[in-house]
Amino acid sequence: KSNGFVIANVLRRTFRRRRVSAGSYKPDPGSAPGMPTGSPLSHPSQGFVIAYGPEGYVEHACRDLDEINRFTGVWPVVWVNVIGLGSIDIIEKVGTMFAIDRLLLEDVLDTSHRPKTEYYEHHIFTIIKGGLLGDQFESEHISIFLKKNVVIVFEEKPGSSFSNVRERIRRGTGKMRGHGSDYLYYALLDEVIDKYF
């Protein structure tokens, strides 16, 4: 089966499930459209990169987001992971680097937004609700952008939502390193759904 068929099935499973929203922080009424507004209670944002291909992988914590450019166009697949939604400057810069519309960044920051998938000319945008297991279960707002050779993920909270996918990349087992960004997108969605539902 093609990756597109598999992705469609994963998304179908998502929307058959009950939808649960995390805590909400929306812009004030009358705010200019497309102007991101984060919650003062949100975790500070931190950028991470995992870049990989059949020959290996590299992980990097970004002190400066411009460091992402060292990986894009060099590695077959680049996964940009922004953890925490509290640093608007970081979120906006990632949006600028990857030509993400500011209205979509507003959806990234709206933790009450319902799950959805939208198809654009150069990318797919998905919002999904994940879950963090600890002393008690916590819902998490996750936004994923699939672009050519790049997947950008915004996570509301620090945690281990994608620990299994990371381990598969590190170990080089299965299909992960031999497939493109569309397979990474599918694997991320699949892990969220398996953990949350």
PLM regions and their residue ranges:
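Peripheral, non-transmembrane regulatory/ligand-interaction domains of membrane transport proteins
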Residues: K1-F197
